[in-house]
Amino acid sequence: MRFCFLLAVLVSANALSDEAAHARKRWAESPYGPMLERILPPTFNAAHLPEAGSDGAKLARRYCVQCHNLPNPAMHEPARWPRVVDRMVVRMQGRGNMGTLMADMMAGVEAPSDEERIALLAYFRRNGQAPIDHARYPELERPSGEAFRLACSQCHVLPDPRRHTASEWRAVVARMQQNMQWMNRVVGSHPIQGEPQLRIEEINAFLAKYAKR
């Protein structure tokens, strides 16, 4: 019985992987591929998804990669995800803010059912970014918290340091540095006087000080 269960999980995972690969190939080869490819960075993949075996994670792998790279649930705080998911579903249905161009771009794209949309939203909200409580961390306004505050607020709400351990944070920060380089955000590879620089050591030090134990 256990073998049958594991086999079913493996078959399901392979099917989702094939589905995702097919979807990525479709949009990458479309006339709009270069634009779709730039929507989200490619550094987050299925192995990084929280609750990887859950229905929500499967729905994310099935639907979200039809138009762009896989989103990280932590890219938005829970309160923001309803607006984002609703907007994405409208676009998958061939509607949205680009008229006939949107319909053309979404040709062949499958939209989730109402039940799937609810499950997908619940998954993203459950694993969304927990915003930092500024009152709990007065160091944010001190020089030692500046590097973290300035760098991380460029793309999302400041995360609560208790979300990860210090070692986990180092891996997250390394991935975020790749994202910022990909998006042409401030990375500080060539310091220029007067421009803000990405200070990785200071960011990791701040996060390690308050990280989950």
Predicted features along the sequence, with ranges:
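Gly/Gly-Pro-rich "capping" loops immediately C-terminal to redox-active cysteine motifs
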Residues: 55-57, 69-94, 154-182
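Sec-dependent signal peptide recognition
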Residues: 1-6
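C-terminal capping alpha-helices of c-type cytochrome domains
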Residues: 106-135, 190-213
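Electrostatic cytochrome c docking/interface patches
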Residues: 23-58, 126-147
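Inter-heme linker and motif-flanking segments adjacent to c-type heme-binding CXXCH motifs
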Residues: 71-76, 126-139, 158-167, 209-213
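Extended, hydrophobic interaction surfaces within ordered domains
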Residues: 18-22, 78-127, 180, 184
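The canonical Cys-X-X-Cys-His
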Residues: 61-70, 120, 148-159, 203
